Design a protein with these regions (language model features):
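Conserved SAM-binding strand-loop segment of SAM-dependent methyltransferases
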Residues: 124-140
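A conserved beta-strand element that flanks and buttresses the S-adenosyl-L-methionine
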Residues: 152
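Conserved SAM-binding loop of SAM-dependent methyltransferases across substrates and taxa
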Residues: 96-106
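Conserved SAM-binding motif I beta-strand of class I
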Residues: 107-112
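Short, glycine-/aromatic-enriched active-site segment of Class I SAM-dependent methyltransferases
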Residues: 182-205, 209-210
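N-terminal juxtadomain amphipathic helix
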Residues: 1-67, 227-228
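Conserved class I S-adenosyl-L-methionine
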Residues: 85-95
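A short glycine-rich, Lys/Arg-flanked "PGG" loop and its adjoining helix->strand segment in the class I
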Residues: 164-181
Length: 232
């Protein structure tokens, strides 16, 4: 696959990571460069940051700290219940449970690799796997809990480096009529608003609709609805 490098934003430290010292020694920096993939039409970081450097037991961002996000997830949960009436739901990147907690009346499973956050949802009696989302994990979850009517993921899929495996794992965990709901930054909106700050270590990709179609069709998934949100 041919890649065209087109933007170099220099060296940056890890985000969402508070360090113990004012001037820590050997702080990790990465080269923030962007690439365009000619076949898939994906925009990605030229070099990915190792996931465990970003997502670990010191991860700082908690979605429920924002009143706006708390209300947005509560509203979205109501919308999903009304439209799809799921009997089971899986969230990839469940953070501190701000979304998945609204589905306590059905089978609700979280996947969250940051242990400090996974511990929070476990205390909320939400079964949470403190693992990175992979095909192997999807098989393990299927074996124990069955497949799901809805799989939801907000601001997480763009963080995962192996996209083909990611979507195959999602397809593997959905019921025949199941729905996957993805919420991530839009390349179009980022360009229209000159939001270059959407490009950083966690955002391995920033998706266009064309790129998403090219990736999801490999896994047997089909895009049937697109909405623009104001929360990211």
């Amino acid at each position: 696959m041919k890649k065209i490098n087109f933007l170099n934003l220099g060296k940056h430290p890890i985000t969402n990571n508070f360090l113990p010292n004012v001037k820590p020694k050997n702080e990790f920096f990465y080269n923030l460069k962007l690439s365009y993939h000619t076949k898939t039409k994906l925009i990605s970081l030229n070099n990915f940051v190792p996931p465990k450097k970003m997502f670990n037991n010191r991860y700082a961002h908690r979605a429920s700290a924002s009143m706006t996000m708390r209300q947005a997830y509560a509203d979205l949960a109501k919308k999903i219940k009304k439209k799809f009436n799921p009997r089971s739901i899986l969230e990839i990147g469940s953070n501190d449970g701000v979304f998945i907690k609204h589905f306590s009346d059905v089978q609700n499973i979280g996947v969250e690799p940051c242990k400090n956050l996974a511990d929070l949802t476990t205390k909320m009696k939400i079964k949470t796997y403190d693992k990175f989302w992979t095909f192997q994990l999807s098989k393990k979850i299927n074996k124990k809990h069955g497949k799901f009517d809805v799989i939801y993921s907000a601001n997480t899929i763009s963080h995962i480096h192996k996209l083909n495996e990611t979507f195959k794992a999602i397809e593997n965990s959905l019921n025949v009529e199941g729905v996957f709901i993805l919420e991530d930054p839009s390349l179009l909106k980022s360009l229209q608003k000159l939001s270059y700050d959407q490009f950083y270590d966690e955002h391995a990709y920033v998706f266009s609709i064309t790129a998403l179609k090219n990736i999801t069709k490999k896994s047997g998934l089909e895009i049937f609805n697109i909405e623009t949100l104001n929360t990211h």
